[in-house]
Amino acid sequence: MIHSGAVMSMSILAFCLLACIHSGINAYPAKPASPRDGAPPEELAKYYSALRHYINLITRQRYGKRDTPDTVFSDVLMRESTESIPGSNYVRYDGLPLW
């Protein structure tokens, strides 16, 4: 009885992992197909436009929960609570340049 429960749990886990992997593959944009050799300029222009769009999609900035006003207030509270601890060497990296 216990063995069949373990097999069932493992099969459900495997199914969930496959579903997550499959959804992750479909969520990422596909790279445009490169034109054939000797392609006309119109086809090259269309390819470069699609390539530029693809690069813009995969390199765009993603805005998340840190941009909401609620987290700004909680960030201030978190900073004050960590600085009030004696001997705390908490360093914030917000001022460093992003590469």
Curated annotation (Swiss-Prot):
Q: Where in the cell is it found?
A: Secreted
Q: Which residues form the propeptide?
A: 65-99
Q: What's a GO biological-process term for it?
A: feeding behavior
User: Superkingdom, according to UniProt?
Assistant: Eukaryota
Q: Tell me, in a sentence or two, what this protein's role is.
A: Gastrointestinal hormone and neuropeptide.
Homology family: Belongs to the NPY family.
This one is known as Peptide YY-like
Provenance organism: Dicentrarchus labrax
Gene from which this protein is expressed? pyy
